[in-house]
Amino acid sequence: MNFIDEVKIYIKGGNGGNGCVSFHREKFIDRGGPDGGDGGHGGSVIFRSNHHLNTLVNYRYKQHFTAENGKNGQGSNRSGKSGKPLVLDVPIGTQIFSEDGNILLYDFIEDDQSFEIIKGGSGGLGNSHFKTSVNQAPRKRTEGEVAKEMWIHLSLKLLSDVGFVGLPNAGKSTFLSVVTAAKPKIADYPFTTLVPNLGVVYVDDEEFVIADIPGLIEGAHQGHGLGDKFLKHIERCRVLIHLIDGSSNDVVADYNTVRFELESYSDYLKNKIEIICLNKCDVLTDEEIQDKINKLRKVTNKEVFPISTYTNIGVNKIVKLALEVIKNQE
């Protein structure tokens, strides 16, 4: 299934049904009173979050959605049937924006949230409403209200507690596969991850959600590579795990490249708590590990954790540290 996180769609509420002009007809009664029923209300357009969905692919090919119109009123004071509401399911993390993308209309952050974006048109009034002492046989009725219509922009930002960042092939997908049941595509070449992957990490009786996005390259915040498109998916996370390829010849340059892209993209990412991990330490000597850690500490002023996602060394420690950070922010 394609991962779709941006769509533009047209929505329209159902129009109200028209009121009816009718007069009571009964044997031996020549001039029955007005008995025109009201029109039914049009259906509303409602968005609802659904935890079973993780992409906006349902809106890629069908882009026009209209709720059902209300039925017209009938004689004998029979009101028209109201139109059915149109319920559109979206993944948790979906944001609804105005057509130009400048105004946030709603943000779905929990399962089964509902948002009535367009109310159906009101039904028109039948002629029975217009009977007066001086007008016993009114032929007046009103038409149903025409419902609103609009184009809107849907944007999906995945919800996770932890986000992985790093250059391509730093080992993020391997880390995800080791600590969760997620099965991302993994190989020893850059850009194995082409779409975001989510996994749930279980620690004793607790759990948190972790997100792996395509690796960043220099210029990602300007649209280079794959990372820029998916950086928004880690904006909501509480902590970043920054993986650095320990086999790289210049781990400091690798770290700085990713940090620059994060800081250039948004202040949200710039100010995230960061856990720095030197990965692939299984292919390094103890002296090489310490040398690279010292270099990273010098530029980051932070603790750097040596790990190997291949041999699982140090991984559990990082998982528990991430959980501790998450709990401290609750």
From Swiss-Prot:
Compartments where found: Cytoplasm
Database matches in Gene3D superfamilies: GTP1/OBG domain, P-loop containing nucleotide triphosphate hydrolases
Main location: cytoplasm
GO molecular function annotations of the record: GTP binding; GTPase activity; magnesium ion binding
Domain of life (superkingdom): Bacteria
Domain spans labelled OBG-type G: 160-327
Cofactor(s) in the UniProt record: Mg(2+)
Record-annotated Obg domain positions: 1-159
Annotated coiled-coil segments of the chain: none
GO terms classed as biological process: ribosome biogenesis
Binding site for GTP: 166-173, 191-195, 212-215, 279-282, 308-310
Pfam families: GTP1_OBG, MMR_HSR1
Binding sites annotated in the UniProt record for Mg(2+): S173, T193
Keywords: Cytoplasm, GTP-binding, Hydrolase, Magnesium, Metal-binding, Nucleotide-binding
The EC number(s) this enzyme carries: 3.6.5.-
HAMAP family: GTPase_Obg (MF_01454)
Quaternary context: Monomer.
Recorded family membership: Belongs to the TRAFAC class OBG-HflX-like GTPase superfamily. OBG GTPase family.
Function: An essential GTPase which binds GTP, GDP and possibly (p)ppGpp with moderate affinity, with high nucleotide exchange rates and a fairly low GTP hydrolysis rate. Plays a role in control of the cell cycle, stress response, ribosome biogenesis and in those bacteria that undergo differentiation, in morphogenesis control.
Protein known as: GTPase Obg
